Design a protein with these regions (language model features):
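Residue-level hotspots within well-ordered secondary structure
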Residues: 1-145
């Protein structure tokens, strides 16, 4: 179970087509060498696609790119959506409205490397069933050791 290196969730998400806002959770260990860390997005629209994002900084851009949600990360941010090189994959929320991903902390997007003592922020993006739009979860920060 993740210890106190995980801060509280931040950045209020907008409700998606389920009527609920989607929320982030993390589990596992913030110890980089353990390589046992899982991101989970809950209360997503059913049967929709999405992926996780990360950034060293927090931000707030409402309805970014015409979405129904708020981007809670600062720039630059990185996407866990490239299955071809093992740094991520596009995920499916299924009938439970949730998806999880356990990144390889030694093979992060765009050659990012987590350093001991750094704080990183995570958020999930997903399609929303309200027409041709998308939405985001809230954000969560984690200090790695």
């Amino acid at each position: 179970m993740l210890d106190s290196c995980s801060g509280p969730n931040y950045c209020t998400p907008n409700p998606n087509c389920s009527g609920q806002p989607a929320v982030m959770a993390v589990s596992g260990s913030p110890v980089i060498t353990d390589n046992n860390f899982t991101l989970t997005a809950n209360q997503l629209p059913l049967n929709e696609w999405g992926y996780f994002l990360m950034s060293e900084s927090q931000g707030f851009i409402p309805n970014v790119g015409g979405s129904s949600g708020n981007l809670c990360l600062g720039f630059p941010f990185y996407r866990f959506n490239n299955a071809s090189n093992g740094t991520g994959k596009v995920l499916f929320s299924g009938s439970g409205g949730t998806f999880s991903f356990s990144p390889d902390l030694t093979n992060l997007p765009q050659n990012v490397t987590f350093m001991i003592g750094e704080t990183w922020n995570f958020q999930a993006w997903s399609r929303d069933c309200k027409g041709s739009t998308s939405n985001f979860t809230d954000g969560i920060e984690v200090m790695f050791r």
